[in-house]
């Protein structure tokens, strides 16, 4: 326990002792603090208080070493005491530390901190702590020279620059940016610069630079040197033209700068020249201006600046005044010597010099070259070898230079004079001792008397000599200088003559050598010379030499051995300047020294190390495998001292490099390696050779020789042969294509021309006449074309193969034929589009000739119909064109078949009249509607129902107009009915379908229908005979089945014809009565008392049965067709071309209606209200027209579905669906189920022909239609082409080869060959069967039908 108490007491005592020592502030180790100028720093000082008790009060004092009083005192809460140097920058930090802000370089030093405890005693020595503060600062100058300092020229100047910084900076001097070091001119020591022997070159800016790691400081001082002026910009030579102002500049600098400038002309002040002082001015900057210069102002001008210090400098320049050439002081008389050469001079003054001098003699230009012995000199003078009297005259000269001329000279008269001559000549040589007297004679005479003068050749003599009045030269005492060549000159106005002599002075020292030459090397010099006159005694030579930089007393004499005139001097220093001279001597003395020659010996060749030649290896070696080898390419070395001489190419396959080529030119950058082994890996590298050095190898490029094939041959221009062959082949193909196209075009044109020659049918068209009060028929005028209609068909010369009797064509027909040719050629060349063809057809191509009556309605006059029944066909429409809608027309035309014309159609040929020039054409044919749907055969009831469903059937009630909605023959209007308006054809687009109106068929036709009453010369019934029927069927796909009616699917009437029975047996009960058409009630045969002039063309008659939409019509029994022989098949509704070019529609004959099927007169029944005329002689058309005045013109009224007034089928409501039919194949003939019939057009309509009217028989051929009129065909609604006849044997009998018209099908013609049928056409009885072997009955078919009924 006691031990623990003692230990506690000891620890307390120890603690108190430590506290006492801390309070007393025992000294600690000094602290070092570093700061940068401008920063803040804390000088640390700690205070230790007792462990127990309250801290006693204390005072903090900070001292700086070297400052006697504290710089900072702090006690308690009282404000501190701060030294003024630290005011605002010193403060107490923590308890006793000192904080200094913005420290400066002056703050650097030792600082002491003292803490005084007020309640304790302390030891002064042991109390306090020391801190050393180091301030790092950039250099700053404490002493610098002034910005400008002056120094006199020739004196010296010292400039001192002192800098302070931490660390201590280094001070250097620079002049104009160049560092100055210790030299003879400048001395640099501890920041001071001393310049000795100050000159003008020492002036300028001097810079003092003090720098350390903390930064640098720079001070600049300008040294001004006092002295005379220095010309900075001297004047320069100038050239001005006359009357311009001259400007000479002169700028000088000096310190002080009180400069004055003085100008001199030819060493005389410009202000002292009378003519110049009024035209000059000196500016303050020293510039001299001379106004309106004259030629006399040319010369040297000198500028002298001055500032009253020292000697003034000067600078000179020359002024050149340019002016046109002029003549000065032309003498009025020019003397030319006689017998010797003379000159005619022109005193020219020009700047620049004269280039041309032109002479005039006696007012005329002088041709100098034309005078023998005359020469024009370069200065413009004329040299005359020997003057004669021809040279006499008055001369003027006109000089020219680049500026022109001032005019010609004053006139000068040429006078011939004798030249002066010597009366006494001096001797060749005179020898006399020096000091003696000598007289050399010389005398001359002439007119005028010459003046004699003497002169020494070369250097003038300064000895005492004179020329006597007699002309002699007198030497009173000869001297050494008199030695030499002398000349005696006699001169007058004519010319000057000379005489020479040589004077030798004996007894003198040698003359000086001449022509000294020195050839030097590095240590030797070879001196040579030409000796002078020896003075009459033997002379010797010596060579004198010295270094050029030595003084005049350092000459060294080298004796020359007697004889030679050269000396080799050796032991010379290389690259040193030496001076040489030669001295001659004899016994009387020495000569003068020759001229001094200064030369420099050559320097020893400095042995320099061989220059380092840097050759880098070639770059970017690339190996490209080609079909023939390997193409190696590279770039030249990046660095090379000299051009590359060549390249070396190496390769390796294994480990060893082998040489491939070592002679590749240095300008190349590619190499082609050939003849390589197959399937081998190659590595290549390239080296550059420059002089004798070889560079390092380039990078290694590897490539395999696999798949290397021979490269295709290249042409000289670099193209591969396949490419060239392709180009040539393409060119040849194009050339061949062009050639074949040209040949094809020529062939087509030739064929077209042959076809045009073969086809002579004119364009047949349906036109309407322009408004006219009378037609050609009504007016009684018969054109030449109308004669054709009166001829019989058998009279045609074309069809008979005989030469055609060409007749004179009317202008109208010629115009139509030209239009026909142009349109045909355009369409046949396939250049017409459909729209273009339609437009052209509308403008130029008529469809059918129709005469317009006085009331504006279209008229077909039956009065002109010829009653011939031999041929019953309508001439073909040659303008029918096969299009996408109607291909059968072109095919039918191309078939070139010429079937025989039925007798019912042949009667219409003679009633056609030619076109009139006042007629216009209808629109082109309608577009084909793809909505056409072939339908099955229906009965009359079905057709009637369909027409009623589509709105085409007329009600039984009477209508205001008999024409209804279709074309038809109208009966005479009853008194109570309103006259229908005339029909005018509007100009519309392409119609939908074509409608062809037909008159009643003749009674003697083969189909059992009555003929037109006018042809038999009998009156007609007043009843209406409907002649139109719209069947409902289409083409049957079976060749031997019952054909469908293609006309049944149209909502337009299309082709309106009477029905036709198929060629099969009909039950007796179903056959019509005699005299009545089949399928019609007997009430339809009411014959009127008189035949009407206008007949109504009724709507088509339908079958009595279901409508098309209610069910198909059953096909006829096949047994009815089995007993018929194989005949060409023609589908119903087809338009077949005949030999006349007309499309013949194939119409079905309806099944016979049962009795009572129609309860009365039906509008849709076939109305046969024709009276049966009695056989009687047929009058001619004109006789019939005169015999029956009640016959009127047949007028066509517009139908509701007229192709010229209606819209397309697709836009009509209630239209049956139409479907596109398949394109028929030309040449295939099907067995006809029913006979065909052609309708006879009105008499007012004519079909023109290209040649004379055709009068051939029905069996004869005619040309097919013109292709140019095919697009305008109006009957292409439902027409189809003919199929080709099936293969089989030729017909054996007359009836085997007959078609349904009783005609023999004509094969295709070749050239102009026309085939004729062997047998006449058969007739078709009322039963519908062909009678081939039996003769034709005497009675007409209508009579047989009526008798049977």
From Swiss-Prot:
What keyword terms does UniProt attach to this protein? Cell adhesion, Cell membrane, Disulfide bond, Glycoprotein, Immunoglobulin domain, Membrane, Methylation, Neurogenesis, Phosphoprotein, Postsynaptic cell membrane, Repeat, Signal, Synapse, Transmembrane, Transmembrane helix
> Could you mention a single GO BP entry for this protein?
nervous system development
Q: Where is the composition biased (Low complexity)?
A: 985-998, 1251-1271
Q: Which residues cross the membrane?
A: 723-743
Question: Phosphoserine is carried by which residues?
Answer: 775, 783, 794, 1207, 1215
Outline the extent of the Ig-like domain. Answer: 24-129, 139-226, 228-320, 324-415, 420-504
**Keyword ATP-binding: yes or no?**
no
Q: How is it modified after translation?
A: N-glycosylated and sialylated. Not significantly O-glycosylated.
Subunit structure, as described in the record: Found in a complex with MAGI2 and NLGN2, where it interacts with MAGI2 (via PDZ 5 and PDZ 6 domains).
Role summary: Transmembrane protein which is abundantly expressed in interneurons, where it may regulate inhibitory synapse development. May mediate homophilic cell adhesion.
Q: Which family does it belong to?
A: Belongs to the immunoglobulin superfamily. Turtle family.
Spell out the protein name for this chain. Answer: Protein turtle homolog B
Question: What is the scientific name of the source organism?
Answer: Homo sapiens (Human)
């Amino acid at each position: 326990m006691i031990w623990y108490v003692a230990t506690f007491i000891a620890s307390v005592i120890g603690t108190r002792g430590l506290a006492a020592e801390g309070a007393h502030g025992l000294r600690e180790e000094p602290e070092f603090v570093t700061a940068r100028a401008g920063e803040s720093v804390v000088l640390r000082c700690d205070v230790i208080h007792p462990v127990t008790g309250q801290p006693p009060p204390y005072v903090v004092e900070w001292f700086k070493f070297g400052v006697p009083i504290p710089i900072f005192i702090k006690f308690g809460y009282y404000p501190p005491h701060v030294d003024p140097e630290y005011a605002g920058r010193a403060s107490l930090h923590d308890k006793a530390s000192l904080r200094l802000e913005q420290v400066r370089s002056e703050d650097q030093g030792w600082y002491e901190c003292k803490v005084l405890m007020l309640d304790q005693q302390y030891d002064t020595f042991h109390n306090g702590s020391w801190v050393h503060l180091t301030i790092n600062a950039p250099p700053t100058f404490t002493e610098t020279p002034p910005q400008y300092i002056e120094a006199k020229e020739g004196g010296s100047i010292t400039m001192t620059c002192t800098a302070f910084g931490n660390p201590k900076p280094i001070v250097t001097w620079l002049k104009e940016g160049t560092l100055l070091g210790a030299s003879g001119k400048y001395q640099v020591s501890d920041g001071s610069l001393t310049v000795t022997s100050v000159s003008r070159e020492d002036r300028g800016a001097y810079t003092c630079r003090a720098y350390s790691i903390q930064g640098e400081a720079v001070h600049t001082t300008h040294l001004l040197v006092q002295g005379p002026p220095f010309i900075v910009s001297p004047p320069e030579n100038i050239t001005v033209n006359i009357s311009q102002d001259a400007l000479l500049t002169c700028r000088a600098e000096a310190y002080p700068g009180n400069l004055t400038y003085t100008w001199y002309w030819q060493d005389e002040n410009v202000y002292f020249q009378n003519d110049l002082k009024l035209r000059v001015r000196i500016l303050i900057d020293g510039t001299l201006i001379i106004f309106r210069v004259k030629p006399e102002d040319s010369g040297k001008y000198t500028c002298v600046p001055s500032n009253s210090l020292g000697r003034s400098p000067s600078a000179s320049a020359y002024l050149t005044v340019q002016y046109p050439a002029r003549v000065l002081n032309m003498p009025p008389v020019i003397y030319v010597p006689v017998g010797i050469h003379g000159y005619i001079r022109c005193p020219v003054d020009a700047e620049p010099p004269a280039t041309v001098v032109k002479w005039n003699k006696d007012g005329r230009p002088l041709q100098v070259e034309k005078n023998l012995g005359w020469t024009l000199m370069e200065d413009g003078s004329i040299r005359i070898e020997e003057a004669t009297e021809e040279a006499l005259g008055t001369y003027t000269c006109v000089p020219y230079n680049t500026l022109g001329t001032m005019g010609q000279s004053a006139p000068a008269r040429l006078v011939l004079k004798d030249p002066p001559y010597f009366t006494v000549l001096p001797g060749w040589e005179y020898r006399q001792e020096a000091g003696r007297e000598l007289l050399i004679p010389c005398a001359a005479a002439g007119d005028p008397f010459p003046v004699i003068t003497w002169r020494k050749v070369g250097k003038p003599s300064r000895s005492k000599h004179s020329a006597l009045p007699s002309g002699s030269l007198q030497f009173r005492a000869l001297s050494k200088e008199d030695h030499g060549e002398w000349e005696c000159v006699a001169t007058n106005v004519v010319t000057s003559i000379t005489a020479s002599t040589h004077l030798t002075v004996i007894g003198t020292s040698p003359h000086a050598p001449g022509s000294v030459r020195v050839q030097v090397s590095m240590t030797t010099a070879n001196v040579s010379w030409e000796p002078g006159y020896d003075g009459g005694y033997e002379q010797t030579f010596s060579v004198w030499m010295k270094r050029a930089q030595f003084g005049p007393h350092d000459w060294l004499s080298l004796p020359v051995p007697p004889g030679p005139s050269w000396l080799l001097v050796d032991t010379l220093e290389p690259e040193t300047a030496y001076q040489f001279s030669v001295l001659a001597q004899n016994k009387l003395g020495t000569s003068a020294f020759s001229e001094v020659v200064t030369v420099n010996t050559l320097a020893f060749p400095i042995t320099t190390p061989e220059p380092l030649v840097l050759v880098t290896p070639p770059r970017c070696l690339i190996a490209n495998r080609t079909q023939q080898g390997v193409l190696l390419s590279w770039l030249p070395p990046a660095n090379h001292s000299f051009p590359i001489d060549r390249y070396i190419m190496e390769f390796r396959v294994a480990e060893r490099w082998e040489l491939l080529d070592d002679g590749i030119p240095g300008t190349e950058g590619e190499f082609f390696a050939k003849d390589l082994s197959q399937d081998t890996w190659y590595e290549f590298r390239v080296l550059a050779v420059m002089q004798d050095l070889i560079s390092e190898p380039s990078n290694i490029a590897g490539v395999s020789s696999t798949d290397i094939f021979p490269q295709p041959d290249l042409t000289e221009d670099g193209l591969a042969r396949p490419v060239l062959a392709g180009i040539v082949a393409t060119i040849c193909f194009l050339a061949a294509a062009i050639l074949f196209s040209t040949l094809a075009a020529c062939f087509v044109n030739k064929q077209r021309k042959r076809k045009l020659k073969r086809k002579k049918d004119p364009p047949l068209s349906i036109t309407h006449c322009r408004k006219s009060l009378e037609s050609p028929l009504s007016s009684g005028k018969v054109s030449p074309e109308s004669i054709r209609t009166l001829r019989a068909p058998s009279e045609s010369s074309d069809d008979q193969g005989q030469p055609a009797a060409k007749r004179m064509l009317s202008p109208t027909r010629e115009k139509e034929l030209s239009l026909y040719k142009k349109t045909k050629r355009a369409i046949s060349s396939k250049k017409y589009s459909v729209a273009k063809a339609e437009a052209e057809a509308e403008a130029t191509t008529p469809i059918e000739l129709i005469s317009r009556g006085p009331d504006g309605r279209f008229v077909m006059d039956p009065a002109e119909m010829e009653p011939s029944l031999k041929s019953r066909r309508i001439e073909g429409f040659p303008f029918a064109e096969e299009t996408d809608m109607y291909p059968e027309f072109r095919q039918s035309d191309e078939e070139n078949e010429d079937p025989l014309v039925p007798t019912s159609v042949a009667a219409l040929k003679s009633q056609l009249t030619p076109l009139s020039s006042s007629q216009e054409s209808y629109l082109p044919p309608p577009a084909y509607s793809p909505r056409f749907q072939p339908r099955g055969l229906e009965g009359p009831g079905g057709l009637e129902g369909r027409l009623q469903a589509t709105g085409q059937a007329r009600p039984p009630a009477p209508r205001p107009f008999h024409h209804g909605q279709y074309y038809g023959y109208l009966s005479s209007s009853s008194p109570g009915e309103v006259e229908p308006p005339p029909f005018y054809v509007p100009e519309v687009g392409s119609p939908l379908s074509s409608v062809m109106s037909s008159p009643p068929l003749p009674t003697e036709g083969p189909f059992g229908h009555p003929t037109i009453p006018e042809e038999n010369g009998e009156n007609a019934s007043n009843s209406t005979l409907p002649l139109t029927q719209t069947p409902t069927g289409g083409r049957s796909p079976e060749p031997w089945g019952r054909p469908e009616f293609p006309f049944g699917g149209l909502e337009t009437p299309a082709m309106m014809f009477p029905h036709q029975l198929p060629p099969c047996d009909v039950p007796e009960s179903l056959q019509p009565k005699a005299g009545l058409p089949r399928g019609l009630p007997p009430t339809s045969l009411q014959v009127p008392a008189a035949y009407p002039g206008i007949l109504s063309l009724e709507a088509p008659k339908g079958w009595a049965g279901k409508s098309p939409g209610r069910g198909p019509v059953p096909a006829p029994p096949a047994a009815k067709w089995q007993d018929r022989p194989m005949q060409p098949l023609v589908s119903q509704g087809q338009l077949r071309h005949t030999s006349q070019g007309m499309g013949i529609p194939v119409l079905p004959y309806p099944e016979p209606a049962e009795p009572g099927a129609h309860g009365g007169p039906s509008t849709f029944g076939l109305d046969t209200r024709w009276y049966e005329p009695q056989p009687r002689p047929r009058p001619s058309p004109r006789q019939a027209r005169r015999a029956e005045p009640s016959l009127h013109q047949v007028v066509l009224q517009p139908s509701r579905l007229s192709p010229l007034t209606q819209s397309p089928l697709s836009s009509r409501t209630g239209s049956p669906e139409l479907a596109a039919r398949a394109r028929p194949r030309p040449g295939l003939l099907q067995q006809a189920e029913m006979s065909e019939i052609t309708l006879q057009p009105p008499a007012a309509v004519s079909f023109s022909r290209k040649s004379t009217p055709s009068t051939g028989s029905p069996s004869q051929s005619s040309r097919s239609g013109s292709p140019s009129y095919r697009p305008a065909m109006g009957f292409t609604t439902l027409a189809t082409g003919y199929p080709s006849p099936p293969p089989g044997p030729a017909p054996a009998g007359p009836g085997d080869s007959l078609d349904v018209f009783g005609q023999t099908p004509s094969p295709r013609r070749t050239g102009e060959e026309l085939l004729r049928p062997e047998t006449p056409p058969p007739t078709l009885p009322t039963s519908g069967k062909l009678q081939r072997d039996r003769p034709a009955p005497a009675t007409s078919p209508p009579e047989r039908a009526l008798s049977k009924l």
